[in-house]
Amino acid sequence: MVSVVFSGVMYTAVLLGCYDGDTCTLSFQEAPPFLAIQKVRFVDFDTPELGGAKCVSERKLAEKARNLTQGFLEKQGLLYTDGKRGKYGRLLVSAPDLRGTLISKKLARAYSGGKRNGWCD
């Protein structure tokens, strides 16, 4: 179970899976059916792309980042959101502990928008 804090209220969700290290899908238990399944995008960090990997090393890093993110959410799963949505309509969430762990393991980089650097040498 994942807990998501929005406007001081904690909501419960089930992790359906992660596409890569910074994009996952959650099923909110208390939401109306049209809001129940939400893709979420973690803010403040960027991880390697899994589907659009430009080299083998990026794909390997992306798999590690995805696995770490999934494990984090399955064990600790505390996220925060202000309800805003990103460029592709995903709910923007933050997870400071996850961010720090991914960055310390070199599976993510700090990110605040704009052009991103590549992951291939």
Regions found by a protein language model. Give the residues of each.
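Small beta-barrel nucleic-acid-binding modules, primarily SNase/OB-fold domains
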Residues: 1-121
